[in-house]
Each structure stands twice: as structure tokens, then as C-alpha cells.
Amino acid sequence: MKTFSAKPAEVTKKWIVIDATGLVVGRLATLVANRLRGKHLPTYTPHVDCGDHVIIVNAAKVVLTGRKRENKVYYHHTGFIGGIKERTAKSILEGRFPERVVEKAIERMIPRGPLGRMQMGNLRVYGGPDHPHEAQQPEPLNVAVMNRKNMRAA
């Protein structure tokens, strides 16, 4: 029996929606990264974008365990000399774009390269409860019931 290798034309992509209210960031990110890559499928092929389209709503209501909300620091560089900037997870979650915490967690679990960028394009994260993708009829995925550790009281 030969090893199965999916062709891009054979891949069928589903749309799933996840409500992130009260979910632990790292556990949510691992599950979503595997879904984006297609590793949950028996037909997974490493060089083909065979993952699903994932919509995450209520990303502003995610939970960080321990003291990570106050202590976790996100760095970026402006490109100028001495231009390293830092922000805590708390300041990002309370700021203008709270969904960036979830996006960065997932982005850092996806391989860097052309295929990884394409797979990250299948991710949509919204801070509030609404999303404009009702026409795609996304299936809800309840992450909280998969494992009791996935959910924390805020």
C-alpha cells in the first residue's frame, strides 16, 4: 500500500467557530493551530494546506493561568536603534485590539514560511461576539467540553 498524499484540489475545507469565553489561551491556541494545519485529519499532508477555516469570537474574554496576565511580556522592535518595545498581556487585553494575544499564540505555533502564512490566512479572530461569516455556515466547536482543563473561571 502506498503512502497517501493529498492534492490541493482534493482538499475539502470546513468552517468552524469557537467561542473563546473563559478558555485558557495556550490550550485554545494548540487546538486551533492543529485545526489550521489539518493535523486532526487522517488525510494530513505536510506540504498541502488541508486545514479548516477557524473563526474565534469573544477573544477578549480569554484567560491566562497563573500570573501571566500581569507578568507575560510581548516584545516588538520599531526598526530603529534602541527601538525595542514591550507590553504586558494585561495591557493588550484591555487595549484596542485584545484579539492579538490569541493571534500571536496561534501564530507562534504555526511553522514559519509560505505555507504557514497561507494557513494563518484561514484564521479570523474577533474580540466581540459577532462575526461577518454567517454565509459560510460555520459549525460550532465546543472546546470547553473536550477537557476540563480547557476552561477557567475568569
Swiss-Prot record:
The protein, known as: Large ribosomal subunit protein uL13
Transmembrane regions: none
GO biological process terms held by the UniProt record: negative regulation of translation; translation
Cited CDD domains: Ribosomal_L13 (cd00392)
An example molecular function term from Gene Ontology annotations: mRNA binding
Subunit structure: Part of the 50S ribosomal subunit.
Gene Ontology cellular component list: cytosolic large ribosomal subunit
Family to which the UniProt record says this protein belongs: Belongs to the universal ribosomal protein uL13 family.
InterPro entries tied to this protein: Ribosomal_uL13 (IPR005822), Ribosomal_uL13_bac-type (IPR005823), Ribosomal_uL13_sf (IPR036899)
Keyword Transferase: no
UniProt entry tagged with the keyword Ribosomal protein: yes
Domain of life: Bacteria
Keywords assigned by UniProt, alphabetized: Ribonucleoprotein, Ribosomal protein
Species for this entry: Rhodopseudomonas palustris (strain BisB18)
Stated role: This protein is one of the early assembly proteins of the 50S ribosomal subunit, although it is not seen to bind rRNA by itself. It is important during the early stages of 50S assembly.
NCBIfam families: rplM_bact (TIGR01066)
